[in-house]
């Protein structure tokens, strides 16, 4: 029997068998299982990926937190280093590698003679640190948020190899020991003979670490364009790029309602238009009442300052810089086509690509216009003045918002209290301080009650040891007479005129209010090298070149109250026009001779009153340090196109006809000479120095007017600059007038002695100055003072250490 089951079939009409297809019902289950496997695998894969992503995200989070901790630590370490460095007040001018290494490691005497240590801020110690590294250790010991993250941290902070400080970890969240940073401070050897400290910050978050480092320069800088113990006067047509500081007003009798103001600033826009003068006067009243931060500007959107502008009539923000200043009033007065700018030079504007202009300020005050147009030369802050800066408004013949006008570009620092000044002045101090002050964004425009740590007096006595080196440079060279004879014998263009054959000159020369008269030896067209000008020379040098050290000798023991006046002369003219020169004073007690041999009846031959007209100095001028300020006798005047050069990269040198000769002299200096010259090109503490002319002498082609160029750190007792002057550096004044002593022995007030930039008259306290309302007054000149933050300093000035970050040394993962 066949047990094979027949297939389902049926007979068709032809009798043939037809096979029916079998239904396979299990395929659905198979497909379902396949999709189940696929989706299950995908789910597992997604779960694995999600878990991986979570782990990656968690790791990335910890990496980010560790990096943030490291960045925080680097900022913290930099600020701590800066804070502790400020405690160290040193007389050393340049912090070279040797001195910096000793200061860092503590191999230095902290006895107040060369190094002074100020108390710590925010914590106390039982003993003073021996050096900067130990001071950092003390500061970290006082931290509240340091803790022990791992074994061995309990031994920190600790100094290793006398060069490196390792600190305890510092947690970022109180009570959370998972996220923290630890710091390392290490002295770095540098090829440029600088002192650098490398801060390494290691951030950690739950076992993940990130390490970064950066180097910081240990240096010394005086962060002011002018530091003066006497009052500062900034006149019209004077711009300052840099902070100003004075401690005038702290002594009795200095503040008063007359001229006893720590600083006086005059508007640059006076004397241009009568209606503008009236508008400036009204604006000053508003500033005195509403200016809350002392910057001489009013903000339309400020809740208090804006009140001054709501009902002020024509006062508006013309240049669109969000402030109303004197510059807006100037634009309003001279912008004839209301385009928000004033064209003053069509040739400049065409060269800058500005066409179809209407000249609106032509030949009204070209020196002022050029001064504003060429201020803040590096407009894009790239370190180079080029066509890009011209596109941003530099020297383009247009005065507008791109010039970013400011009378002072920096902070004004005063030791006095604001209320004390206002009380003595009889009104707000802004009544005598005109013009806008534009400070850095993170700094206040005005600081009152500046501490001695921030703003220190510079005195004549600080430079007692500096003269020795400068004088030694003249020991082995021919004296003044020998060098003069050599010039006369080799160059027919040179000339010497003895004083007996010369003309009488007023002292100061050119002043409308002279206090003495003198006849001088005259030297013309000569070249002097490392020359000593002996006391009693009282000479005039015209178109002479001085290379190396020019040393001015005088009698230092000049404290007798009559030293200024012995031998002084008056010019007497009778009705017939005959002129004689007679004693100005009679019956004066003579001054004792320093050697005790006899009395001195005429101190001119014991002093030095010199005039340099159109001279060139390649190197430095220095002199003996007088024990008292005797401006009638110990005085230097620089007039005409006087030039000072030392930097071979100075762009101004290439514009000179004698550029090759200048560069030859500069390149011939030894490294030691260059080092001393760069610290101060004018080392004349205690002397009276006049720069420029008492009358604003302009050339027939006004742009060819000679400019007096001063470079570097300028150290004098009192300095007056007038006319056309360009200063790039820092002015350090040393004379502080005190009632009933020195030049005030017979009366007078301290406000009679000022550091003056620009033209002022006797009514302003400048007794030598010109009456600005007189018919003979011929314009305000053009003075630019630019602070050089890279200026080296001479030894002797006690000033705190400064720390500067060096961004290009930032490194991730190194060290």
Outline where the language-model segments fall:
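Intrinsically disordered, low-complexity domain-flanking/linker segments in eukaryotic proteins
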Residues: 100, 105, 111, 122, ...
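Beta-strand/loop motifs with alternating small/hydrophobic and polar/acidic residues, enriched
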Residues: 2-229, 248, 266-290, 296, ...
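Short, solvent-exposed secondary-structure capping/transition elements
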Residues: 82-86, 417, 631
């Amino acid at each position: 029997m066949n047990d094979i089951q027949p297939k389902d079939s049926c007979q068709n009409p032809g009798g043939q068998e037809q096979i029916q297809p079998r239904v396979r019902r299990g395929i659905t289950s198979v497909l379902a299982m396949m999709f189940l496997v696929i989706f299950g695998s995908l789910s597992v894969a997604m779960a694995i990926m999600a878990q991986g992503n979570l782990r990656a995200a968690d790791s990335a989070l910890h990496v980010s937190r560790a990096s943030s901790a490291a960045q925080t630590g680097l900022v913290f370490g930099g600020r701590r280093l800066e804070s502790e460095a400020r405690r160290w007040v040193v007389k050393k001018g340049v912090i070279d590698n040797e001195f910096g290494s000793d200061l860092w490691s503590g191999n230095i005497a902290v006895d107040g003679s060369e190094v002074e240590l100020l108390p710590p801020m925010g914590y106390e110690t039982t003993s003073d640190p021996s050096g900067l590294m130990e001071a950092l250790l003390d500061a970290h010991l006082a931290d509240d948020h340091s803790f022990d993250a791992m074994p061995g941290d309990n031994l920190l902070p600790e100094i290793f190899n006398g060069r490196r400080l390792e600190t305890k970890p510092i947690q970022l969240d109180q009570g959370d020991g998972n996220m923290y940073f630890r710091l390392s401070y290490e002295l770095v050897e540098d090829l440029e003979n600088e002192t650098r400290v490398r801060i390494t910050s290691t951030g950690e978050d739950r076992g993940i670490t990130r390490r970064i480092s950066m180097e910081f320069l240990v240096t010394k800088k005086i962060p002011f364009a002018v530091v003066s113990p006497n009052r500062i006067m900034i006149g019209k047509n004077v711009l300052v790029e840099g902070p100003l500081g004075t401690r005038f007003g702290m002594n009795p009798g200095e503040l008063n309602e007359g001229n006893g103001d720590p600083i006086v600033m005059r508007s640059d826009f006076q004397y241009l238009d009568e209606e503008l003068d009236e508008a400036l006067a009204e604006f000053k009243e508003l500033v005195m009442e509403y200016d809350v931060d002392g910057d001489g500007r009013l903000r339309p959107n400020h809740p208090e300052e804006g009140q001054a502008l709501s009902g002020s009539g024509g006062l508006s923000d013309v240049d669109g810089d969000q402030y109303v200043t004197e510059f807006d009033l100037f634009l309003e007065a001279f912008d004839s086509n209301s385009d928000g700018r004033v064209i003053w030079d069509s040739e400049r504007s065409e060269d800058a690509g500005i066409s179809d202009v209407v000249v609106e300020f032509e030949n009204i005050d070209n020196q002022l216009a050029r001064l504003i147009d060429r201020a803040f030369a590096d407009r894009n802050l790239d370190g180079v003045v080029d066509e890009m800066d011209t596109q941003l408004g530099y020297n383009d013949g247009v005065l507008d918002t791109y010039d970013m006008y400011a009378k002072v570009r920096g902070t004004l620092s005063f030791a006095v209290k604001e209320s004390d000044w206002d009380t003595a002045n009889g009104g707000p101090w802004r009544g005598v301080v005109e013009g806008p002050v534009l400070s850095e964004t993170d700094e206040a425009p005005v600081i009152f009650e500046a501490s001695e740590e921030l703003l220190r007096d510079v005195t004549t006595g600080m430079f007692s040891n500096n003269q020795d080196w400068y004088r030694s440079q003249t020991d082995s060279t021919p004296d003044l007479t020998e060098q003069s004879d050599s010039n006369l014998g080799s160059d027919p263009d040179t000339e010497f005129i003895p004083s007996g054959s010369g003309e009488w000159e007023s002292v100061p020369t050119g002043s409308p209010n002279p206090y003495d008269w003198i006849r001088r030896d005259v030297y013309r067209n000569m070249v002097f090298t490392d020359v000593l000008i002996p006391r009693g020379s009282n000479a005039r040098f015209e178109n002479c070149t001085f290379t190396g050290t020019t040393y001015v000798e005088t009698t230092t023991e000049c404290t007798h109250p009559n030293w200024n006046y012995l031998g002084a002369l008056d010019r007497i003219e009778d009705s017939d026009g005959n002129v004689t020169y007679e004693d100005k004073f009679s019956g004066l007690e003579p001054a004792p001779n320093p050697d005790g041999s006899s009395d001195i009846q005429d101190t001119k031959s014991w002093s030095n009153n010199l005039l340099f007209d159109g001279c060139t100095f390649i190197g430095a001028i220095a002199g003996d340090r007088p024990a008292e300020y005797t401006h009638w006798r110990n005085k230097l005047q620089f007039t005409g196109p006087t030039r000072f050069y030392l930097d071979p990269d100075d762009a101004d040198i290439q514009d000179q006809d004698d550029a090759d000769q200048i560069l030859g002299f500069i390149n011939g200096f030894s490294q030691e000479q260059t080092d001393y010259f760069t610290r101060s090109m004018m080392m004349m503490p205690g002397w009276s120095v006049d720069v420029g002319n008492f009358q604003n002498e302009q050339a027939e082609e006004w742009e060819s007017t000679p400019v007096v160029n001063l470079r570097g750190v300028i150290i004098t007792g009192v300095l007056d600059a007038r006319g056309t002057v360009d200063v790039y550096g820092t002015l350090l004044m040393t004379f502080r007038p005190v009632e009933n002593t020195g030049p005030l022995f017979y009366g007078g007030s301290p406000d009679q002695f000022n550091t003056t930039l620009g033209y002022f008259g006797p009514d302003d306290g400048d007794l030598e100055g010109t009456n600005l309302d007189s018919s003979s007054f011929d314009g305000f000149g053009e003075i630019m003072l630019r602070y050089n933050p890279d200026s080296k300093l001479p030894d002797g000035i006690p000033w705190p250490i400064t720390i500067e970050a060096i961004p290009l040394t930032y490194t991730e993962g190194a060290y």
